Amino acid sequence: MPLPQNRSKRNMLHKGTPMRKTGKVIAIVQARLGSTRLPMKSLLCLRDVPVIDWVTRRLAQAAKLDGIMVAVPDTPLDRVLMEHLQRRGVPCVAGSEDDVLARFCLAARTADAGRVVRVCADNPLIWAGAIDRLVDFYDQGGWDYAYNHIPRNNLWPDGLGAEILSRDLLEELDAKAAQTSQREHCLNYIWDNAASFKIGTFDPEEDWLRRPELKLDMDRSDDFCRLALKPIHPDMDARDIVRVFG
């Protein structure tokens, strides 16, 4: 089946050594309990299931992933989250709270990732199908970085997808990113220097999935309340999710 047409406006090739697209594909989930906008959000429950379990459970259905690693801050508060993940047998690692890029790289090294899929822990409705399509799109194109987690130059709902880049590029970002914003928001260096990278995205194939106005993530308390009031469950497929939020 042909891949959806790229809609990226960023098409300049990365200047430097081509990034290898080999090795294990690892989803790294950035999770924490210290959010100021929605404290403890990773352990808040939707339908009696903690949000972090929604994310890891739904990611486990992705055929293109070789593993999952959760990256949490090394704070006393987040030790509760680490213990929760360890009890469930979910691989996890603790790193710097403020230097998220360093923590992300630590997780990639710990998991021996070759390609890294970045996932936000506030996306409880993340869809395995979106992850698989993203990996295929990235592998079959000449992209340095690709994404479908937000409706930027594409028609995806907000919160179903992710971002992907090579471990080589991630290590390069770690070496070059000097601004505080680039360390805290770990892939900002790419967007700050977009002319130096080939950035790709694509549309969903299905008309019913082309819903960029839908917000499915859980960033604030009102997002949590909206999700909590919907008849959703952790194994729900994308068509039913779109129908419920329609």
Residue ranges and their predicted role:
Residues 19-38:
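N-terminal nucleotide-binding beta1-loop-alpha1 segment
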Residues 88, 126-213, 244-246:
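Conserved core of the sugar-phosphate nucleotidyltransferase
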Residues 15, 20, 215-246:
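Hydrophobic helical membrane-anchoring modules
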Residues 51-68, 87-88:
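A short, N-terminal amphipathic alpha-helix
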Residues 74-139:
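Short phosphate-binding loop-to-helix
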